[in-house]
A protein has these predicted regions:
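Juxtamembrane and boundary regions of transmembrane helices in multi-pass small-molecule transporters
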Residues: 120-125, 189, 193-197, 214-240, ...
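Transmembrane alpha-helices that form the ion-translocation and gating core
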Residues: 15-26, 49, 90-160, 325-332, ...
Length: 451
């Protein structure tokens, strides 16, 4: 009976997620919104109001079903972050470097700082979880304002047929820089929460790190030490492991080899005392752009040896993860409309103005800067990962968890609608970068030199 009950719950979650994703994809909106709304319909917000007995029977709080769904939720989270790492492959914006630099600096530093300032100026203690503190809450708030979604925005641009444009190169290059830096900040935040509770594990526990100051220092350095070697030589290491003679798994089941890589990297991250999502991120970076993975971005194509894992992840694990995120939302009890409205307005305004300012300083015109700003506002998967990990660590409570998830959904939908409107009108998303005066003078001098 327990197995039958679990299978019924999985069928309901998977079916609701895919139906919701299909409907939103049909209206040219990010499928992730539909997948979460599918879970929302099965949770206390909808089904719990219409038929509370059926909702409690389908998703009980005790027994084997919640344990298995919790495990699938965590695996889906790790594989989603793995795919995010796969998205961080080299779409190099060589001719748009000035825009990338200005937008990355202005669009990350300013929103994060403004988020910190508001979080310290406004009393947000009512949004802290059992292990949260004013400092960790402020860091989560700042990250929520500054974060950008690589998977969602890349999927939007693929669907619109603009993935090979200068606009896509700018947005994705900036998003990669932002997300990597914000993942490091997330490691510091979770480490501070560990120090507050004394529930450290791995190397920090062996070293006896138990003060906030020691935790901040350790969790700033440890993720960088863990990330840098794999970001620098990870692809080469992956190719060597995949092509090694002793690697019998790659030839027989490439998806199994990649899943083993993800889990091994997650265990290594846990051994260092940092959240396993960093191991999944590094596994994705190692596997991205390798000789066996093909050159096309993940959502577009399906080529390469890792296609089977990607298809299984997007068909099962990620929809179940997003559906459970929706299932855990209780809008009737944990949505504060006043807080969410000003939080949404503040986050979107600060992020948009900061990105717009950076793009304008780089030489983009008003419309191009606005397009980049709205695209960079899509928080999507990373915003939901931030909500999930900080809520699981006890840094935030259900009210802020709900607000962060809704912020990710609304901004992703808005970015998709805006960019779709621009493309359908045949308007340019960006203008070519204008050469600097020095570069123009050098070009004119070169033209005057006789052949």
């Amino acid at each position: 009976m327990d197995v039958a009950h679990l299978l019924i719950a999985l069928v309901a979650l998977l079916g609701a997620a895919h139906i919701g994703g299909y409907l939103f994809n049909a209206i040219r909106q990010p499928p992730v919104i539909g997948e979460i709304l599918g879970g929302l319909c099965l949770g206390p917000t909808v089904l719990g109001q219409l038929a509370p007995g059926a909702q409690h029977w389908l998703f009980p709080s005790t027994g084997p079903t919640p344990g298995v769904l919790g495990a699938l939720y965590n695996i889906g989270l790790l594989l989603l972050v793995y795919l995010t790492g796969m998205e961080m492959r080299g779409r190099r914006a060589r001719t748009e470097r000035r825009t990338v630099v200005w937008v990355a600096v202005s669009g990350l530093v300013l929103p994060f700082l403004f988020g910190l300032l508001v979080a310290t100026a406004v009393d947000l203690n009512g949004l802290a979880g059992p292990h949260g503190s004013p400092a960790t809450l402020a860091l989560v708030f700042g990250m929520a304002v500054a974060i950008t979604s690589i998977p969602v925005i890349s999927r939007i641009m693929i669907d619109l047929g603009v993935i090979d444009t200068a606009f896509a190169r700018i947005v994705l290059a900036v998003a990669v820089v932002e997300d990597i830096l914000l993942y490091v900040v997330l490691a510091v935040t979770l480490g501070m929460a560990q120090a507050r509770t004394g529930d450290s594990y791995g190397l920090p526990k062996l070293l006896g790190i138990d003060t906030v100051g020691e935790s901040v220092a350790y969790f700033t350095i440890a993720p960088l030490i863990f990330m840098l070697p794999f970001a620098w030589r990870g692809r080469m290491l992956f190719d060597r492991l995949a092509s090694a003679r002793f690697n019998l798994i790659e030839g027989r089941a490439p998806a199994a080899f990649r899943m083993i890589l993800v889990f091994v990297m997650c265990v290594a991250a846990i051994g260092l005392g940092i959240d396993p999502v960093f191991g999944a991120l590094m596994a994705g970076l190692c596997a991205s752009g390798g000789a066996r993975e093909g050159a096309n971005p993940l959502p577009a194509g399906g080529g390469g040896s890792g296609a089977a894992l990607r298809e299984m992840t997007l068909a099962f694990f990620v929809p179940v993860y997003f559906a459970i995120v929706g299932l855990r939302l209780d809008l009737a009890r944990h949505l504060d409309p006043v807080f969410f409205c000003w939080f949404l307005a503040f986050a979107c305004t600060v992020k948009s103005i900061s990105v717009w300012l950076g793009a304008r300083l780089a030489g983009q015109d008003n419309s191009s800067a606005a397009n980049i700003a709205i695209a960079m506002n899509a928080r999507g998967g990373p915003g939901i990962v931030l909500a999930s990990t900080s809520f699981a660590a006890g840094v935030i409570n259900e009210n802020l968890f709900t607000a962060l998830v809704l912020l990710s959904l609304v901004t992703s939908q808005a970015a998709g609608a805006w960019l779709g409107r621009i493309v359908r009108r045949g308007l340019p998303l960006t203008v070519p970068e204008k050469p600097r005066p020095q570069e123009s003078d050098e070009a004119e001098d070169a033209a005057r030199i006789p052949a």
